[in-house]
Amino acid sequence: MSNLWTPSIEVESVNGTREVSLTTRHLMNRNVFLQGTIDSDMANQFLSQLLYLEQELEEPVTIYINSPGGEVNAGLVIYDAIQGSNLEINMICTGMAASMAAILFCSFFSVRFSSSL
């Protein structure tokens, strides 16, 4: 997984304004990203995000995938987590989905390629 800098943004709440990472804000909006090489770190992060989102089943989750693939075992962790979830999940390919990422992407009924978000 990439160690890129993640920008912070301000969000309003009943307690005032607070700063959260953009990744956290996306998670609050039920958006999850699978970007980069699939490995055990990505699988563990994804699993923890999905388990968190399962606390509220009313709203669908959107997974954005852009990956050259990666480790089969890690990909199977992601696959099993999604297939075992009670969430309504949509998946969007925002670049490429090759190798293990293609297996994940093609295993869903609600998928699409995105030329623009």
Question: Which residue stretches match the model-derived regions?
Answer:
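Terminal-region recognition feature
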Residues: 1-117
